[in-house]
Amino acid sequence: MDYPVTAACQCGQVSYTLNKKPIKVLACHCCECQILSSSPFSITAVVSKEDIHFQGEMKHWSRIADSGNQNHAKFCPSCGTRIYHVNPAQPDLIKLKLKPVGASIDQDFAPIIHVWTSEKPAWYQIPVGIETLEKQ
């Protein structure tokens, strides 16, 4: 895949340019991510803060995750699309929630690990050969 790539929220008010492939991509099955995504998991692409540039104003909220980590969430104030999360203890890592859409990037955003599988719905089957963690 050729970088940089761009993506935008549903209304287009918030966008980003990603200059490098994600460090890693995971699928999180925790209950919070199931609520966020309205599906059995949400995808998180971990990227270096220096490799991504955001445009547009975002709102934020914070909570303590089940892991005990602080989770600061950024989202579009107009359409509500979640853009990214950041843990203040790891400020150089962006946990990107909004992935670029397009066939050419699919492989770069395929999850290599599924986390919080202890909370996944019983009917969802993780593909054979993918690493799993019951928690994080």
Task: Enumerate the language-model features and the residues they cover.
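A short Gly-Trp-Pro
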Residues: 1-8, 13-136
